Amino acid sequence: MKKVCHLTSVHQRDDIRIFHKECKSLQHIYEISLVVADGRGDDVVDGIIIYDVGKPSARWERMILTTKRVYKKALMLDADIYHFHDPELIPIGLKLLKKNKKVIYDVHEDVPKQLLSKPYLNKFILKIISNAFKKYENKSAKKFTAIITVVPEITNRLKQFNDKTVEIRNYPKLNEFAKINVQWKDRENAMVYIGSISEIRGIYEMMQVAYKANIKLHLAGNFSTPALESDLQNHKEWQQVIYHGVISRDNVVELLSKVKIGLLLLHPVPNHLIGLNTKIFEYLAAGLPIIASDMLHYKEIIEVNNCGFCINPFDIDAIV
């Protein structure tokens, strides 16, 4: 049986796309291993072997030392195919190609556009970095065995450099939601947001909506920084938040089955203008109407199918 090794220096071991969709889908025909850097130790989960190279204490450590640890572990495992999920692992992927390995690059985000939204550098420098990375990614794309993308914009760009570029969208597994049997009218009059928690993903606006409407906001996921978590908890609006932490897939489904509204108030930064957030499909699968940002690709799904509203995410009064 051929061996496939997934590599990530950023994502958690129970990442939905990586572990639950890709690793589990492949394990029936391949021997699957997953290399992570989340600090939770080695493990075997559902027959998938997980190797942990240790959680970095800072971004610089992750970019420099963790990537080296991932590469060292990858070499030790001697897989037939390597499938990596983070742009910072591109150099690792290129090194593995030189070892005559097949290497797949899984592009979860439009990184050049994502870089334009980073808060810790000025716009001029960000534009230079974004353009430089785009050239580097395009050049590297030519060399990989295959590329997997999530949205047409990324697919169209990278397919110019590698014709083995395939788009696999991040849709939910509907069988996870089949057990929901709570009628909408019987659910708690509350809202929910599940996912990465950050300023550009609208956390402050969601809290303001909950506070002004005087209804609870159920929140689950990772905070982008400890400083953000601390700041949020010091706001008066936090009293309307019920924070569940990082929760399992079963608990995600359970939480979505208890509330009445799904929120997705993303800020209109470049990466959000093309990316299609998986949460809207999970909300719909759970029978939730959605309040989302007024971006065209969300309007085409939500408003056309009459399953919610798309509103300016900064207009709190209109949302309420």
Map each language-model feature to its residues.
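N-terminal subdomain of nucleotide-sugar transferases
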Residues: 1-40, 46, 146-148, 152, ...
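Conserved donor-binding/catalytic core segment of Leloir-type glycosyltransferases
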Residues: 5-7, 148, 184-218
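Membrane-proximal helix-turn-helix segments that form the acceptor-binding/catalytic region
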Residues: 22-24, 68-75, 95, 105, ...
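Donor nucleotide-sugar binding/catalytic pocket of nucleotide-sugar-dependent glycosyltransferases
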Residues: 51-52, 127-179, 186
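Short N-terminal targeting/anchoring amphipathic segment
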Residues: 73-90, 101-104
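Nucleotide-activated donor-binding/catalytic signature segment of Leloir-type glycosyltransferases, i.e.
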Residues: 218-221, 229-254
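Short hydrophobic beta-strand element within catalytic cores of glycosyltransferases
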Residues: 261-264, 282-292
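Conserved acidic donor-binding segment of nucleotide-sugar-dependent glycosyltransferases
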Residues: 304-305, 309-316
